[in-house]
Swiss-Prot record:
Record's function text: May function as a substrate adapter for CUL4-DDB1 E3 ubiquitin-protein ligase complex. Negative regulator of fatty acid biosynthetic process and accumulation. Acts as an abscisic acid (ABA) negative regulator. Involved in responses to salt (NaCl) and osmotic (e.g. in response to mannitol and PEG) stresses.
Sequence motif Nuclear localization signal, residues: 245-257
PANTHER family per the UniProt record, alphabetical: WD AND TETRATRICOPEPTIDE REPEATS PROTEIN 1, WD REPEAT DOMAIN-CONTAINING FAMILY
Originating species: Arabidopsis thaliana
Record-linked PROSITE patterns: WD_REPEATS_2, WD_REPEATS_REGION
Positions of S-12-hydroxyfarnesyl cysteine lipidation: 754
Entry's transmembrane regions: none
WD repeats: 6-43, 48-87, 91-132, 145-185, 213-253, 277-316, 618-658, 661-700
Pathways involved: Protein modification; protein ubiquitination
Outcome of swapping residue 754 to S: Impaired farnesylation leading to a constitutive localizes in both cytosol and nucleus, as well as reduced interaction with HDA9
Entry protein name: Protein ALTERED SEED GERMINATION 2
Length: 757
């Protein structure tokens, strides 16, 4: 949008500053300056793998790039020449999902983790030095203590002795090369290695208010570069967890399942913290370069930024509790947190003093008028939202409350018109903040009622609509809104009565569950509290299936044990009809025990989102990354199921660049430690190297498939439709992983040829 400026200043001024003051800070600001980001294009394509490239990592000085692939090989590339130095036949028997250089080893030690549940360490000094002559070498260390796929490895800067591995078995293990270089396979008679740093086999939460109970299949982990005692993990539920390694219990054996240790913080957007999102899970978590923020990427969702430490910012970021989630949707005439007038900020940002004078106010006023015009005309809604983001996220402290209130209401209305996934939840936030400024705001109440109606919360919507009608009884729109909500309530009541009369037990085939489309991605997830309490549908279903599929310690089932068709009997808790034989008395006792656990459990708080980044699609793989670009981390990048990768401005969420990087799905994004260079990979067998070589800055540039001609908004609209059609089902992620590994006799369910999940 031409009306929006960039917040990192003029690059020529930076170059002039560097000539006068050659400081490291100027170089950091130059690395991914907006003018360079908008000139990124594909520089080279690295060929050397024969399968999907699932992992990328740079060494500490950026001279080498390492990659891991479905071809079971690790490749090491020279950055300067862009040539393949080594190709290691690892000996893994399943896809390699992660690989790293071990710090302070002259880049001679590399480590890999794979789908065979093994972690392998290699010494590259034993290789021939020519990639075409490299053969399988004996690992310097071999750890076989995991029981399921190893999805992510972490190393500590400056520590050459330890590597951490996160696995779908629910454990994060610490491997110290000084203590041992091997451990026997899990489940063997002599398997007693004490390497479990985090035991989260009973750590997954259905909701913030629920106690941890199910296995948390770990998908990602990261160690803070600035505070290496901080450890971040994410997996098969909605909550990323921050741990202080100094406060964790001693390393333990995996023979006994331990209760999950307390974490420093949970991270989860407030609207994703409720029950009813069974299949929601994280695919990537990472710290910002300065360690003050974390980035979360969700499957079937967006990318979210959060503060590591609890605090308040322009978006109202805070640590919330389960009660706060309910309060956000509840009508109250007395808002206890009415906003106080903001303090005008004069803090320098990016080396330049932020304007707090009349020019800034004039600019913000113009942007709000542009957004309001787009709302009235129904055109350019995406860019109008970006204009509102610029005002609220970049200049919130520079404007008066009245203008901020107007912008909040306008953005809420635009979000409700756009209707991308969870836009209605973002509108609820804006309306809530607008009501904090003006508790008698007609617009805030009207748009809140519209947002809640879109979310299927009709009772709450009627409260706000009625209040708005009292404020302006002659407004035709609010009269129509009240009647519309009343009709929705009547229809919902009739449907509920019909279901009650027909009975609540029904038999579904597995295909019914796996391929059930959600009609409305927002409303299908957001039942009212009373409706959620009336149904324990998800938990009961998972209990039935786990009883029939799992054996004693959560070990993997035999590959032949699930052949043939599978029918599931589903019923609500409290149904008078007897349960099928899939659940025995012991399981019934477990269900009763879980209810008691939930009653006695004291809910913890979580840190809410700071920013949301939208436009990509993440449903096809669970290794899709979201990364900070540059040493200052001022830009956010994510891969997408459409083969593109997206770059946003961190501060405002403004879309900066869309690049085609894969013919199918792009997963991995790793920026160079110091240069304006990015490496990406995905389903293709090649690695793409990107640098700011385009002659003209633009939001879209040529990629591996040639110049992109599609309209950017149309591309994002298509991705949002895929997210909304994302097949939501009551099977947990843990169980879905088991089904993916099987082939049914009917031949209706087959794994992908190139599996990156």
């Amino acid at each position: 949008m031409d009306n929006l400026s960039f917040h990192d200043g003029n690059i020529f001024n930076l170059l002039h500053t560097r000539s006068q003051d050659p400081s490291h800070e100027v170089d950091q600001r130059m690395q991914f300056h907006s003018s360079l980001v908008r000139r990124l294009s594909q520089e080279q394509e690295l060929e050397g793998h024969q399968g999907c490239v699932n992992a990328l990592a740079w060494n500490s000085n950026g001279s080498l790039l390492i990659s891991g692939s479905d071809d079971l090989r690790i490749n090491i590339w020279n950055y300067s020449s862009r040539k393949l130095l080594h190709s290691i036949d690892t000996g893994h028997t399943a896809n390699i999902f992660c690989t790293k250089f071990v710090p302070e080893t002259s880049d001679e030690l590399v480590v890999s983790g794979a789908g065979d549940a093994e972690v392998r360490l290699f010494n590259t000094s034993r290789l021939s030095g020519r990639a075409e002559d490299d053969n399988a070498i004996i690992p310097s260390a071999l750890y076989q203590c995991h029981t399921r796929r190893v999805k992510k490895l972490a190393v500590e800067p400056g520590n050459p002795n330890v590597v951490w591995s996160a696995s779908e078995d629910g454990t994060l293990r610490q491997h110290d090369f000084r203590e041992s270089t091997s451990c026997p396979p899990a489940g063997t008679a002599h398997q007693e290695c004490r390497s479990v740093l985090l035991d989260l086999r009973s750590g997954a939460k259905r909701a913030l208010a629920d106690p941890p109970k199910q296995t948390l299949s770990l998908k990602s982990c990261d160690i803070s570069a600035t505070r290496p005692h901080l450890l971040l993990v994410g997996g098969s539920d909605a909550f990323a967890r921050l741990y202080d390694r100094r406060m964790l219990p001693p390393l333990a054996s995996s023979r006994k399942r331990m209760p999950p240790p307390p974490c420093v913080n949970y991270f989860c957007p407030m609207h994703l913290s409720e029950r009813g999102r069974t299949n929601l899970h994280l695919t990537h978590v990472t710290f910002s370069p300065n360690g003050e923020e974390v980035l979360l990427s969700y499957s079937g969702e967006h990318v979210y930024l959060m503060n590591v430490n609890n605090g308040i910012c322009s978006t109202g970021i805070m640590q919330y509790t389960p009660g706060d989630v309910d309060n956000l949707f509840s009508f109250s005439n007395n808002l206890h947190d009415v906003e106080s007038p903001p303090q005008v900020s004069t803090t320098p940002q990016n080396g330049f003093h932020r304007s707090s004078n009349a020019a800034t106010v004039k600019k913000c006023t113009e942007l709000v008028e542009i957004a309001k015009w787009s709302l009235e005309e129904g055109t350019d809604v995406f860019y109008a939202i970006e204009a509102a983001n610029e005002v609220l996220d970049a200049h919130s402290n520079d404007i008066e409350s009245a203008l901020r209130h107007e912008c909040l209401c306008t953005r809420a209305a635009l979000l409700l018109k756009r209707k991308w996934k969870n836009d209605a939840h973002m509108a609820v936030r804006d309306c809530h903040n607008a009501r904090r400024i003006d508790a008698s705001s007609f617009k805030a109440h009207y748009y809140m009622s519209e947002a809640l109606q879109q979310l299927g919360k009709c009772k709450e919507a009627l409260d706000f609509a009625t209040a708005a009608q009292h404020m302006n009884p002659s407004d035709a729109d609010i009269v129509a809104k009240v009647e519309s909500i009343k009709r929705d309530l009547q229809a919902a009541g009739a449907e509920k009565n019909e279901e009650t009369g027909a009975g609540t037990t029904r038999v579904l085939s597995l295909s019914d569950i796996l391929y059930r489309s959600e009609a409305n991605s927002d409303s299908s997830h957001d039942m009212s509290r009373s409706e959620r309490e009336d149904s324990d549908y998800d938990e009961e279903l998972e209990l039935d299936i786990q009883t029939s599929l799992s054996d004693d310690e959560g070990r993997d089932t035999d590959s032949n044990s699930m052949r043939g068709s599978l029918n599931l009997r589903i019923h609500r808790v409290g149904d008078d009809k007897p349960m099928e034989n899939t659940v025995d008395n012991a399981s019934s006792g477990t269900a009763s025990s879980s209810q008691n656990d939930r009653t006695s459990y004291q809910p913890e708080g979580a840190i809410d989102m700071k920013r949301r980044y939208v436009g990509h699609c993440n449903v096809g793989t669970d290794i899709k990354q979201a990364s900070f670009l540059g040493q200052r981390g001022e830009y956010i990048a994510s891969g997408s199921d459409d083969g593109r990768w997206f770059i946003w401005e961190k501060q405002t969420g403004r879309l900066m660049k869309v690049l085609v990087g894969d013919e199918s799905v792009l997963n991995c994004i790793q920026c160079h430690p110091f240069d304006s260079v990015v490496a990406t990979s995905g389903i293709d067998n090649t690695i793409k190297i990107w640098s700011p070589t385009a002659s003209v800055p633009s939001i879209v540039a040529g990629g591996s498939a040639g110049p992109a001609t599609a309209n950017v908004v149309e591309v994002m609209e298509s991705n949002q439709q895929k997210l909304s059609r994302n097949r939501e089902n009551p099977l947990s992620v843990e169980l879905m992983q088991r089904f993916r590994m099987q082939e049914f006799a009917e031949g209706n369910f087959h794994p992908f040829e190139c599996t990156q999940s």
